[in-house]
Design a protein with these regions (language model features):
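A short SAM/SAH-binding and catalytic strip from SAM-dependent methyltransferases
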Residues: 119-132
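N-terminal, positively charged/glycine-rich alpha-helical extensions of SAM-dependent methyltransferases
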Residues: 1-20
Length: 149
């Protein structure tokens, strides 16, 4: 860390500390299965053909709840490879690997096709790029009538 004037920058922060701290927790942010299900209760019309993305999914605590209560395929995206490795192990443990997969990526550079998603989920993670920016950019990836939660 930079000791000049006691100013530290995020570039000097060791992001491995984040992984070490959060890797063995069920969730990497606020929330609970009950909160996930409450938010999900406002979303309807999902089918087995629905495509869902969980942006900033971490190790997948909320993603696995979504998968157990929705049809369709879910892609979880997170910046940290260690979280995605754990995410995919969790999907296998719950026998969800056929419709739930984790990928490493950045929520500010999505690789999804425009207007391809029925639901974009980001439980406690959109703040990483800013709420307004996330809404403005991510809505382009939603099908007409799609949801962002």
């Amino acid at each position: 860390m930079n000791n000049d004037n006691n100013h530290n920058t995020i570039q000097e922060f060791d992001v491995n500390l984040i992984c070490d701290f959060f890797l063995n927790t069920n969730r990497q942010g606020p929330g609970s299965p009950e909160a996930t299900l409450k938010a999900l209760s406002f979303i309807n019309n999902l089918t087995v053909q629905s495509l869902i993305a969980d942006l900033g999914c971490g190790t997948g605590g909320q993603t696995m709840v979504l998968a157990q209560h929705t049809p369709g395929s879910i892609t979880g995206l997170d910046f940290f490879p260690e979280f995605i490795e754990c995410f995919n192990r969790n999907a296998e443990k719950l026998n969800l690997q056929d419709r739930v997969k984790g990928v490493v990526g950045s929520m500010d550079a999505l690789s999804f096709e425009k207007e391809s998603l029925d639901l974009i989920w980001s439980e406690g993670a959109i703040y990483n790029i800013g709420f307004e920016r996330g809404l403005n950019e991510w809505r382009n990836y939603l099908k007409p009538g799609g949801y962002l939660a």
